[in-house]
Amino acid sequence: MDQNELRELALSKLDQALEALDRGQIDEAKTLIKTMKDEYKHSFDLAEDYVWILLTYIGKTFGEEEVGKASQFRHLINLSQPAQKWSKMKPEDAVRFKALIHRGHHSNITLTEEKDRYVMKLDPCNTGGRMLRMGYDRPPTNLGRTKGAYPWTWGKKNVSYYCVHCAVNEIQSMEKGAPHPTWIYECPENPNDPCIQYCYKRTGDVPEEYFKRIGKKKPKV
C-alpha cells in the first residue's frame, strides 16, 4: 500500500469531497458524498442494533421490567436528552427538531400538517422499524419483545425492547414539564406499515387515551 492510499483511507469522505471540490472535480465530490452517507448509515445501524441486543440481554438475564428501568435511566443521567429538549419547545420547533433527528437516523420521512397537529410518517423508521422489517425479533437472532404491558410500552404487549424508548420519551417529556407528550407514537403492529408520530398544537386537542396509556392524567385546560 502506498502513502497516498494510506492517507486517503485515514481521511473522512467529507474531507475527500471537500478536496475534490477544491480541485473542481464536481462528479467525484458527489460520488464521495453519497459514499459518505452510506458509510455513516452503516455505522449508525450497527450502533442501533447493539442497543436492542443489549436490552435483550438485560431482559433475558434480569427480567423485562429492567428493560423499562434501563430505558428510563438515560433520562436520569446528567446529559440533555431529546425528550427534555422538546418538552419546552413550541410545536413548530419540536417538528423542526424531530425532523433533524430522523434525517440523522436516515429514516424515510413524510411531514404533513393537520388542523390540530403535525404528523410525521416514517416508512420505515430507520431504527426500530428497520430492525423489525429485517426480522431481528425472529430466529436466529430472537431479539426481545415485551411479554407484559406497562406504561413504558403504551399499555401494550409485544413491543420490541428497542421501541420502548419511544414510550419513555412520551412519559419523560411530561415529567420534564410539557403539559402533554410532545411527540405521540403510533408504532405499527405490522412492521411493514409506517411508524406514525403526532405533535399536537394544543393540549386540549390531545385525546385522553394518549395520557392513559402511559399512566398519566390529562390536565385541565
Enumerate the predicted regions with their spans.
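N-terminal accessory segment detector
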Residues: 1-195, 201-221
